[in-house]
């Protein structure tokens, strides 16, 4: 009777660690979902990142100070630049710190920083259509003048709501800043006044909405915070971990499953982590305690838990079977 028992034991143990295909398979994740390295030697101060919905697996970035108003399309598979876009119709950029994509594949670029320590009475946002063909080209942009309701601010974080197209800015303040809300639609005539709404307790260097607009993440140099959008009644949910260093950029992958966090410098890495909470375009991700929490219920955590539970059940079954065979 030993051979049947051994066969049954093997079958039970195999079954214990078997998981559904949906749990073991990541599916067709967008390129860049595991992170990548920006290899273009022209990109040494990547200060913003935006995942393209028009070209899945492509990520738009820019330097905070460059030789001109340039955007770079980076392939998330190779880390190579596949297109450089020059903006026409705008003045000389001062300190370009952020980029986001709104409805209709409209790219918004935030020239909102103060790299030179100057308190500007106004800053600029540029809007342009995302090119349908990825090649080096010049695209005409619209330039918007931006002012803050409570005076000049230094800022590096700009968000564009993926459903409404409304633009938000978070000022950079060591003691924490605020989320500033822009007009429902930006105007190219006159100043667009941004008003403070909820406080953001972080020295923010970038921020991004999830693809469904249900949450947004704010990152700094030493940590991050994520918020539930909650239909505009914003709720702070918890902290997220970030890679240490000159961290300047953040975006969600287009499937809403990963949060990508980038750095400045030559050959700058972009690291991926599960989205916090259960927001994002396709749900999933870790719990509210943060992206890298050891107790998170990301896809890997679920798989391990399923296997562990199965192992316990299998061992219990084996003990029962052994007793049964002994009786025979």
Positions of PLM-derived features:
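Sequence/structural signature of beta-propeller domains
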Residues: 2-15, 20-328
């Amino acid at each position: 009777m030993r051979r049947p028992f051994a066969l049954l034991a093997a079958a039970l143990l195999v079954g214990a660690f078997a998981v559904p295909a949906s749990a073991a398979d990541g599916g067709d994740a967008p390129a860049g979902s595991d992170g990548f390295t920006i290899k273009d030697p022209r990109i040494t101060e990547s200060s913003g990142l935006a995942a393209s919905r028009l070209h899945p697996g492509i990520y738009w970035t820019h330097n905070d100070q460059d030789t001109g108003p340039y955007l770079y399309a980076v392939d998330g598979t190779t880390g190579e630049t596949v297109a450089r876009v020059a903006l026409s119709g705008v003045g000389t950029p001062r300190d370009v710190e952020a980029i986001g994509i709104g409805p209709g594949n409209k790219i918004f670029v935030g020239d909102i920083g103060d790299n030179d320590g100057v308190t500007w009475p106004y800053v600029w946002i540029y809007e342009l259509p995302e090119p349908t063909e990825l090649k080096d080209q010049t695209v005409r942009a619209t330039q918007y003048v931006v002012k803050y309701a409570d005076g000049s601010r230094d800022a590096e974080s700009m968000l564009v709501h993926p459903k409404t197209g409304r633009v938000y800015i978070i000022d950079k303040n060591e003691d924490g800043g605020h989320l500033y809300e822009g007009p429902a639609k930006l105007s190219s005539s006159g100043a667009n006044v941004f008003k403070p709404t909820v406080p953001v307790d972080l020295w923010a260097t970038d921020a991004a909405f999830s693809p469904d607009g249900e949450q947004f993440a704010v990152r700094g140099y030493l940590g991050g915070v994520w918020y539930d959008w909650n239909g505009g009644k914003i709720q702070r949910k918890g902290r997220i971990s970030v890679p240490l260093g000159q961290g300047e950029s953040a975006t969600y992958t287009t499937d809403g499953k990963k949060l990508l966090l980038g750095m400045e410098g030559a050959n700058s890495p972009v690291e991926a982590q599960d989205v916090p909470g259960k927001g994002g375009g396709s749900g999933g991700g870790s719990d509210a305690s943060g992206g890298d929490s050891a107790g998170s219920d990301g896809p890997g955590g679920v798989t391990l838990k399923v296997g562990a539970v199965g192992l316990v059940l299998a061992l219990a079954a084996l003990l029962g079977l052994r007793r049964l065979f002994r009786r025979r």
